[in-house]
Amino acid sequence: MIIYRILSTILFLVSLPFYAAVRACRGKYLPGWQEKLGKFHAPDLGDKVIMFHGVSVGEVIALENLIKKTKETFPDYKIVVTTGTKTGQEIAHKKFDNTADFITYFPFDITICVELFLKKINPSIVLIAETELWPTFAAYCRKKNIPLFVINGRISDSTFKSYSLIKGFFKEIFKNYTEILTQSEEDKEKFIKIGAPAEKTQVMKNLKFDVKRIDADIQIEKGKNRIIIAGSTHKGEDEIILSAFEKLKKEFSDTK
């Protein structure tokens, strides 16, 4: 961990001037780069802050219901939402401008950036979606006694193969997490195999299944229509169902 922090800091300090010069010549900077450095103005959030992080669009959308339910359940707490991409920021503002108390970028995983971020946000608890594992951030959360959770955790097969090569490194990282909550039993086993403590790793349902689906094309008034639902059909069964539906439609015109 110490080696990681030293090397990442050196690499960051060496590359930052070069990056800034190139971007200045092009007149275009990485979206949110100042915020990621810890240079942002945050409102006075107090000492009751729940922080959610989703790196981009998919993760942010998956967090929607949980964030809104958290706000309803804990109205005395401030909600902070962070993302790692511009598109993530856009969807976060679209979804949570009336729910979150502050929306910003997640910091670079460099000591000074993480320290500035945590000082300004002062979270009481941090919940990070899916597979965002940041060693320095996790270490500072533990140092400051901030509970840190992975929620909706998942690891793809390709990521699992890569992480397995340095599972000793990840074993150290997971010591800083309070709990790992995964999407499935398979994901749970993957997390454990790359170093997550079994006693800290549990299965939760996939948050994406909780996302509200709005049917804009059909409004069904209960009790006035005959409705046939065909789910999980196999090859050859669709034709049989459609044939039966056509026969019913002739006899009962309100069949849908």
Name these PLM-found stretches.
Residues L66-T73, I240-S253:
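Short hydrophobic signal-anchor/transmembrane segments that target glycosyltransferases
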Residues L45-M51, K78, G223-I228, D238-I240, ...:
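Charged active-site motifs of nucleotide-sugar-dependent glycosyltransferases
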Residues K161, I214-K224, K235-S243:
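ALDH superfamily catalytic-core signature
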Residues M1-I2, I166:
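Absolute protein N-terminus
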Residues T9, A62, I240:
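Charged catalytic carboxylate motif
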Residues L16-K36, H41-A216, I229, T233:
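Active-site and donor-binding regions of nucleotide-sugar-utilizing enzymes
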Residues I3-L7, L11-F18, V22:
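Membrane-interacting alpha-helical segments
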